[in-house]
A protein has these predicted regions:
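Carbohydrate transferase catalytic cores enriched for Leloir-type hexosyltransferases
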Residues: 83, 99-102, 128, 134
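Generic structural signal for small/hydrophobic residues in well-ordered secondary structure
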Residues: 31-32, 38, 77, 106, ...
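C-terminal anion-handling pockets and recognition modules
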Residues: 108-162
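Acidic/histidine-rich, metal-coordinating catalytic segments
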Residues: 68-82, 106
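RNase H-like polynucleotidyl transferase catalytic core
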Residues: 14-22, 91-110
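Short, basic/hydrophobic alpha-helical segments
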Residues: 52-73
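Short, aromatic/basic amphipathic alpha-helical patches
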Residues: 84-92
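Extended, low-complexity cationic-aromatic segments
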Residues: 1-58, 154-155, 160
Length: 162
């Protein structure tokens, strides 16, 4: 529950105060985005590891009907749970690993400012409250594919698809 602190506008000579509730509890948000359509797909997880990543991949493949006739390239970073030989990649999914230390190349990275927006400068009593706010925010983002496409459909994506 590390707080997300952002700058805000205040009157001159006013000191802004943001109450925080420092705790070390974690909640992981996975985001899948199709840059051309702006469609997103989300998972909230209590932690990340290879087993959960395998479950997320399997769910993603099933939800979108991946297989022999429907293929997708999934761009991921080189986190250990993404690149382990124990990762079970479902049929129809191909992982493409980004170079190290290059989050600016990952379209999904552009979504984090949107998901952090409703929790910025807020104090929450429980992880369940944070989870509820994030679920609502993810639903709002899912309803704005044109906006998401504008953020994530980098000009060079079309060149890669050719």
């Amino acid at each position: 529950m590390k707080p997300v602190i952002r700058r805000i506008w205040v009157d001159e000579w006013t000191v802004p105060i943001a109450q925080v509730n420092w705790r070390f509890q974690w909640l992981w948000l996975y985001a899948f985005v199709h840059p051309r359509s702006g469609q997103t797909y989300w998972w909230l997880l209590p932690y990340v590891n290879i087993q959960l990543f395998n479950k997320v991949l399997a769910d993603f493949a099933q939800h979108f009907g991946m297989g022999e006739r429907k293929q997708v390239i999934l761009v991921v970073d080189q986190a250990g749970w993404h690149s382990s030989p124990k990762v079970k990649i479902p049929p129809g999914i191909h992982l493409e690993f980004l170079p190290s230390h290059s989050p600016e190349l990952q379209p999904a990275e552009r979504l984090w400012t949107l998901t952090n927006e409703p929790i910025a400068n807020q104090s929450f009593e429980s992880l369940a409250q944070v989870e509820e706010v994030l679920i609502q925010r993810c639903r709002q983002i899912m309803d704005q594919p044109d906006f998401v496409r504008g953020l994530t459909n980098f000009s060079w994506w079309s060149e890669l698809a050719a």
